[in-house]
Amino acid sequence: MHFDDFDKEMRKYEESIDQYIPEDKYIVVRLDGRSFTRLTKRVCKFKVPFDEKFRDLMTDTVKSLMESGFKIVYGYTESDEISLLFHPSEDTFSRKVRKINTTLAGEASAAFSLNIGQIATFDSRVVPLPDKKRVGDYFRWRQEDSLRNALQGYCYWTLRDEGKTASQASRILNRKGVKFKKDLLAEKGIDFDSVPNWQRYGCGIYFKEIEREGFNPIKNEKVIAKRRELFVDYEIPYGVEYKDYVLEFLEYDV
């Protein structure tokens, strides 16, 4: 069999489960750290429940992803997860799911590993969304997850610091509501509603147009140059305001 025919025959199997995101759908990609509990608590021993060093590792990873060749207009990170919002005109790899997932998972794993000095991996999933409403709903959902996890984390580690075992702390918090958990923290002198915004709501990353003063040696004069730089927002809004905040990025030029 001629190689071209052989190649065509075998590629049918390789591409048999390929999926493409239709052009009328919005693309969001979520990446999650694999076995990060072990990495952050046992290997690197970051502070709990939050550590600015780990936060910065995650935001730097988002920045790397946003400069990896895709038309990503907004990035969000909380805990060990990342969500990326693509511009509607994104057509890299013809919007093939397999290529998007493998490329971004590889980029995230490489960037994070280089920065932390340890092998770390991420998985990736494409989330196709039908309209802007669901795009906003998606990011509100992840923000609510961040808020829930932050409250749980503060309570859990407060109990651990008091000498409770992991199983004891988990039992105390099992099936308990928000009021119980906030009251528990208040009794220990912690006002959960006053902890840093980024710990409760996560961080947003996006491009801003910055004006920089430069010098034109040919004309021997100062000039103002505009460039896009990535900005980390540690004070993102919450709830409906956050939904509106995210949707604005879909209107940005890329």
Where are these regions (language model features)?
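Regulatory and interdomain segments flanking nucleotide-handling catalytic cores
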Residues: 1-254
